Regions:
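Hydrophobic/aromatic-enriched cytosolic interaction surfaces used to assemble or bind macromolecules
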Residues: 1-398
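Residue-level detector of conserved catalytic or cofactor/ligand-binding positions
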Residues: 397-411
Length: 412
């Protein structure tokens, strides 16, 4: 379910255990204007399985860099990634838009075998499809632990910012990538630090999305171990030197990506076998595009050409701010988060809002009842007063003495 759109500038923040990416963006129609971008290392032990820990430490690090780069937006959008976040494609009856949420919430336990008291459910409408002769609505339903969302709201409070919405990386990627590709059956691979999002599109509509727990960190760790480097130095080495071989051949650095490639292949096979459609185009996006030899290795192992996404449509740069266009593809999650986000809201706020609405309804009802009661009392009273006044007037007329000359003038 899309969130209500916040107007004006937004700060869009993406956090993982390696880095924090921050953008200042203004959304205008289909286009977004990027004012500022900055990436900083994530403080140690501040991000655990998608939950923000040591909020004050993290907020201080973000505040320092935002002040340094003169960010001035008051609203913040987050796009979260967590191994505890689950998604599922779901078909529901073709109901009215305002009925979808209740239907999803009522059937949530069928979608996800977890304790729903501890999770927040949201959805994205993908398309209408025909299923067994009936028109249905295809949704992407997402479930995230409440504590994950609460931790982001806590961070916003520590930053002194108002939460515009909380999206998740899968939806953020979907929203921006459907603007970048054609109608062909397309594979979009987004490799991030802790995992990889695998998307399959057809006619610019998401058909399948899977998250696999193998990301760039596995490759970086292999380089750290082989060359005795720290994380940042290993990352730089991967960007400057071609350490990856073109095929899996036993080299320990290259072999670190075998599980990732194997899982991508599984997702492709699953889609093709169920739909009898082949992948026509494949795209690579995210941090992996800057790693030398990465696209070549995947292309060879998946047996298809892979195109690196290096420029983004519908994204404009603020002419007054210095932002390199070439760097924007590393902020795709930040940028996608402001297009058409879902809105994960803590249950306490939803319940509080419901209570306020109920209280408002009760007050309106009570005031209405008082008005009706008053009218029921006042109307008869007014009628009685008016009747008494009329009777009084008639009595006065009956007492008026008409002089004899006057009487004669009327009857003569």
């Amino acid at each position: 379910m899309a969130a209500s759109k916040a107007k004006g500038k937004l700060v869009s923040i993406v956090i993982n255990n390696e880095y924090i990416k921050i953008c200042e963006i203004t959304k205008s129609g289909k286009n977004s204007v990027v004012h500022k971008t900055v990436t900083i290392p994530a403080p140690e032990d501040c991000y655990v399985d998608g939950v923000i820990e040591q909020t004050d430490v993290l907020a201080k690090a973000i505040k320092v860099v935002m002040d340094e780069h003169r960010f001035n937006a008051n609203n913040v959008a987050f796009s979260i990634s967590s191994p505890r976040l689950a998604t599922k494609e779901v078909l529901i009856p073709n109901v009215k838009a305002n009925k979808i949420d209740k239907l999803v919430q009522a059937n949530a336990t069928e979608y996800f075998p977890v304790n729903m008291d501890e999770y927040i459910i949201q959805y994205t409408v993908l398309e209408k499809v025909e299923d067994q002769g009936q028109e249905k609505i295809k949704l992407m339903v997402a479930a995230v632990p409440s504590e994950v969302v609460e931790s982001y709201y806590g961070l916003a409070k520590a930053l002194g910012l108002k939460v515009a919405f909380v999206d998740y990386a899968g939806n953020s990627t979907y929203q921006i990538m459907k603007q970048q590709i054609g109608p062909e059956v397309s594979l979009v691979i987004q490799v991030e630090n802790d995992g990889t999002v695998i998307n399959i599109f057809k006619d610019n509509v998401l058909q399948l999305q899977r998250n696999v727990p193998y990301g760039k960190s596995m490759l970086v760790n292999a380089v750290m171990e082989k060359y005795g480097l720290k994380y940042e130095a290993a990352t730089t080495k991967l960007q400057n030197e071609t350490l990856l071989h073109s095929r899996f051949d036993g080299d320990e650095v290259t072999e670190s990506l075998r599980y990732m490639a194997s899982n991508i292949n599984r997702v492709i096979d699953y889609y093709v076998s169920r739909n009898r459609l082949s992948i026509q185009k494949a795209y690579l996006i995210g941090h992996s595009t800057s790693i030398k030899g990465f696209a070549t290795l995947l292309s060879n192992e998946l047996n298809m050409p892979i195109e690196k996404v290096e420029r983004l449509k519908n994204i404009a740069l603020d002419k007054k701010a210095y932002v390199e266009e070439a760097t924007l593809t590393s902020y795709v999650t930040n940028l996608g988060a402001v297009i058409d986000p879902v809105d994960f809201i803590p249950k306490r706020l939803i319940e509080s809002g419901a209570r306020k609405e109920n209280t408002k309804t009760l007050i309106v009802g009570f005031v209405g009842a008082l008005v009706v009661s008053a009218l029921l009392v006042l109307i008869p009273l007014v009628q009685v007063v008016a009747l008494n006044a009329e009777i009084g007037s008639l009595n006065k007329l009956s007492l008026i003495h008409i002089s004899e000359p006057t009487r004669r003038s009327y009857i003569s």
